[in-house]
Regions:
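Glycine-rich, N-terminal phosphate-binding loop and its surrounding beta-alpha-beta segment
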Residues: 66, 78-80
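Short beta-strand-centered segments at strand-helix junctions
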Residues: 63-70
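Long, compositionally biased stretches
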Residues: 1-61, 80-139
């Protein structure tokens, strides 16, 4: 993919794709000091498609436990090799970044499978401002 070198074993398979984009099923999870603490979920199928992700522990330390409880029937989070991340969106002006806490991305690194799950009856918000988090950590 462009300048990105990767091994086939690094590809994460999303059998259902991401929400609203079921056609694209293969992604790479990329880390870069330039965008830390964010990660990039890069589509292998469509190089122009990527998602900005963050560990929700930066927002709410109890979020993973909530997702584990809410997702018992689907069991996407099967072991300690699973990561729970949330999709972020940057406003056009770049002044505000929001995180979707209602539809986390769960990646099981043991079998390289991923899914974006919707938490029904979630107390969380689809557009949770990261500015609130920044203000709390600076105080």
């Amino acid at each position: 993919i462009g300048d990105i070198e990767f091994d086939e074993s690094q590809i994460i398979n999303f059998p259902e794709g991401m929400l609203g984009m079921p056609t694209y099923k293969h992604y790479l999870l990329l880390q870069s000091a330039e965008i830390a603490p964010f990660l990039r979920l890069q589509s292998v199928d469509k190089p122009s498609l990527s998602f900005l992700l963050i560990d929700p522990a930066f927002i709410d330390p109890g979020y993973r436990a909530y997702v584990e409880k809410a997702d018992q029937n689907r069991q996407y989070i099967q072991n300690e090799d699973s990561a729970v991340l949330v999709v972020c969106k940057i406003a056009k002006e770049g002044k505000d970044i929001t995180a979707n806490l209602v539809a986390p991305v769960v990646i099981n690194h043991a079998d390289m499978q991923g899914a974006q799950v919707v938490l029904l009856d979630s107390p969380y918000n689809v557009r949770h401002s990261l500015a609130e988090v920044s203000e709390r950590t600076e105080a």
